[in-house]
Amino acid sequence: MRKILVSDYDQTFYLNDEDIEKNKKSVENFRKQENIFIFATGRSYFDFMNKAEQYKLKWDYLIINHGATILDKNNNIISNYTIDNDVIKNIKKDLEIEEAIKYFCCNLENSRTNFNDKDLTKIHAKYEKNKAEQINSLINKKYAEFVNCYFVSGNAVEIISNKTCKSNAIEEIVQIEKVNRENIFTIGDGYSDIEMIKNYNGYCMEKSVQELLKICNGKIVKSVSELIEKI
């Protein structure tokens, strides 16, 4: 039976240059057996493709911006979810952008744009840690009807439409590939990985956020290559 493996990128597939080479080799063998490998990252298209080119990465599907956009291995767009334009102005105000260390927005065409553009797929804002946690809590409480907000590494918050997440994006791919649910495996380390870890055969990295470690039920690995050996 075919299997699907979905991996986060930062602090999961990539820990260091030595680790990523082992992971690449394991994924190559995994795919040779007609299995499906998917990256599910919070990175924008531009940011991920820079790493893909640097490390010569291969995949069958790519989920970017925490699930906002899904592409196949030929970069054809399968789905794209945008933040409701009507709430962006209010979100910008509550983000207190003037206090952000840096910020940027993404849409389908651009990985670095601003609030003036419409059809944004992701908003990124970096702060001091306490401020980032405060903003993350506020956005999730006030705009839960419209968006998902994640606290990410580097003391930043990232906002996407609540119509999607990594887990939902995986489900779209499953509907295309018709793989049995028990043969779908996921691995990650951060807050935006929680749903896909809960909803599939989820594993987490040793240095995952506490909330993720709590739901992994001891299914913890040191690397993607170790997980591939297990499955």
Each language-model region and where it sits:
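Asp-based, Mg2+/Mn2+-dependent phosphohydrolase catalytic module
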Residues: 180, 198-231
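Hydrophobic beta-strand scaffold residues
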Residues: 13, 37, 102-103, 149, ...
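Active-site metal-binding loops of divalent metal-dependent hydrolases
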Residues: 9-11, 43, 188-190
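Short active-site oxyanion
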Residues: 34-38, 58-60, 181-184, 198-202
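Active-site phosphate-binding/coordination module
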Residues: 19-108, 112
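Short, structured coil segments at secondary-structure junctions
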Residues: 55-58, 66, 143, 198-200, ...
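Conserved acidic, metal-coordinating active-site core of Asp-based
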Residues: 98-200, 207
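Asp-based phosphoryl-transfer active-site loop
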Residues: 2-19, 39, 197
